């Protein structure tokens, strides 16, 4: 019995001093882009399986995630847009994790299969208001988009040159809500992360180009944006957060990132 107890005690001592035991390491908190849910979920799960360190994710949207980093309420912010000058002036740093296409989605019943960027812009600014104007059915186009502060919205409006001019019927707070709404309305059109699109909606080609890893990587699919990790330049990450950051920005994470449907930056 004494021998068993001493072995158990020795094991506890070894565990407390070994890098292989992670019970005392704090969790890593991430906050931000709802479009990055899938890739952060995959990376967080892989990292936790390898290290035992938990990664939490708060899907608040890009703008809120950036604010959370600035306020010191999370370790790593997640943004599906580049940092603005005023955000950089707050001492925030952007590291590109991956590139993601923004899919233009319609209801599966919609006969439209391809739109060019100019036509998409005319639709969202109200210049084209009925599907029949571009070869579809006689139905008013229902414009679905994201809320102000969304990285996906920022990227979409920047690429289509429609900032502050979109005539949204609904401005929704998550990628999932956009997909669900378009799936439920035959006259709707929306935009969402390619990595998040489900079979309940149809992705149209843009200028004849289908969004894919290859077309996003070579730039031929033009409706794309970066997935960005946001940190504070003058604030050191915790040991756990630094370990997670180093892993997800390394070549080791490339396969996991690719499995989430986005293109790794490294």
Model-assigned labels for residue ranges:
Residues 4, 22-266:
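Exported/periplasmic ABC-transporter solute-binding proteins
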Residues 2-23:
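Sec-dependent N-terminal signal peptides of Gram-positive bacterial secreted proteins and lipoproteins
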